[in-house]
Amino acid sequence: MGRKKGLPEFEESAPDGFDPENPYKDPVAMVEMREHIVREKWIQIEKAKILREKVKWCYRVEGVNHYQKCRHLVQQYLDSTRGVGWGKDHRPISLHGPKPEAVEAE
C-alpha cells in the first residue's frame, strides 16, 4: 500500500438541486450549500493568512526598502482580505468586495 500520486480530487462546485429562491424546498441541498459556503470562506481566510505571513517575512527581510519590494504582496493581501470574514454577505459589494478592474482605453 503506497500513497497515490497526484492531487486529491474535491467537489468544488455548489451542490446540485439548491434553489436560492426557495432554500427550504430541499433541506439536504440547503445544508450542503451552507457547508459549501463555509468551506469556501475558510479557504479564503487561510489564503489571506498565508499572504499575511509572506508580507511579514518580506518586511523583515527587505528592511527599509519594504515599501518598494513588498508592494505586490501587500496588494495581493489587501485584495484577498476584501469580503473575507463572517457577516459580510449581506453588505453592499461596494463596501467589501474586490475593487473593480480599471479598463485601459485603447
Curated annotation (Swiss-Prot):
InterPro entries: NADH_UbQ_OxRdtase_su10 (IPR019377), NDUFB10 (IPR039993)
Protein's cellular compartments: Mitochondrion inner membrane
Region Disordered, annotated ranges: 1-25
Entry keywords, A to Z: Electron transport, Membrane, Mitochondrion, Mitochondrion inner membrane, Respiratory chain, Transport
Domain of life: Eukaryota
GO BP annotation list: photorespiration
Membrane topology: Peripheral membrane protein
Keyword Transport belongs to the record: yes
Biological role: Accessory subunit of the mitochondrial membrane respiratory chain NADH dehydrogenase (Complex I), that is believed not to be involved in catalysis. Complex I functions in the transfer of electrons from NADH to the respiratory chain. The immediate electron acceptor for the enzyme is believed to be ubiquinone.
Family affiliation: Belongs to the complex I NDUFB10 subunit family.
Quaternary state and interactors: Complex I is composed of at least 49 different subunits.
Protein name in UniProt: NADH dehydrogenase [ubiquinone] 1 beta subcomplex subunit 10-B
Organism this protein belongs to: Arabidopsis thaliana
UniProt lineage: Eukaryota, Viridiplantae, Streptophyta, Embryophyta, Tracheophyta
